[in-house]
């Protein structure tokens, strides 16, 4: 903000916008380590669920994991060949791998919410995901929300330390939609 309280970070000139250009997507294997120089490595660990190709990044030098958004399952878009990765089940499977490596992680930075939290939050989230997988309808809260002009029922399973995993019954399991 400037001295008059205006948010100067929302002001920009058209010349500030980077023009679009074609680029090549280069896939990386699970566990790929980016060498940032001087032996400083950051490892990509799949942590899908919120988005189909999401990774967490483990900073091996500082023992910090940057998880991105892991607060729920993302939308499954029709025709998306990776839609099954936007499920609670996928997040649950990937989170098991991350939690098995807690001895390498001292702190985590999620995509939003609390910052610089202890790695124990990963264990607490896995506990919440376990509860969802056992009984998706037994949520801590259920409410109707409007998304893109459509009503949907949103479920939430609380995570110890003050947040929740949000989902709906159509994006819990990978292969077959959840049916009552």
Where are these regions (language model features)?
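Short N-terminal signal/transit or membrane-insertion segments
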Residues: 1-2, 38-40, 45-55, 138, ...
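Active-site HxH/HxHxD metal-binding segment of metal-dependent hydrolases
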Residues: 1-37, 127, 131-135
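Polar low-complexity intrinsically disordered regions
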Residues: 2-11, 59, 84, 180
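Intrinsically disordered, low-complexity segments enriched in small/polar residues
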Residues: 7, 18-21, 38, 55, ...
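Proline-rich intrinsically disordered, low-complexity coils
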Residues: 19, 27-29, 46, 81, ...
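Flexible, acidic/histidine-containing loops and adjacent segments that form or flank the divalent-metal
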Residues: 24, 30-32, 36, 89, ...
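Metallo-beta-lactamase
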Residues: 41-132
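Accessory terminal helices/loops
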Residues: 93-180
């Amino acid at each position: 903000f400037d001295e008059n309280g205006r948010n100067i970070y929302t002001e920009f000139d058209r010349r500030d916008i980077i023009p679009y250009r074609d680029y090549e997507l280069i896939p990386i294997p699970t566990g790929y380590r980016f060498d940032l120089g001087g032996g400083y490595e950051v490892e990509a660990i799949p942590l899908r669920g919120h988005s189909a190709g999401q990774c967490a990044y483990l900073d091996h030098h500082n023992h910090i994991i940057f998880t991105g958004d892991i607060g729920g399952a993302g939308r499954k878009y029709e025709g998306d060949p990776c839609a099954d990765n936007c499920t609670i089940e996928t997040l649950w499977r990937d989170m098991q791998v991350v939690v098995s490596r807690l001895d390498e992680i001292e702190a985590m930075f999620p995509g939003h919410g609390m910052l610089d939290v202890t790695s124990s939050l990963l264990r607490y989230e896995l506990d919440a995901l376990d509860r969802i997988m056992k009984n998706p309808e037994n949520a801590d809260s259920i409410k109707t929300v409007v998304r893109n002009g459509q009503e949907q029922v949103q479920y939430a399973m609380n995570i110890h330390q003050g947040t929740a995993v949000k989902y709906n019954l159509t994006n819990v399991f990978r292969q077959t939609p959840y049916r009552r």
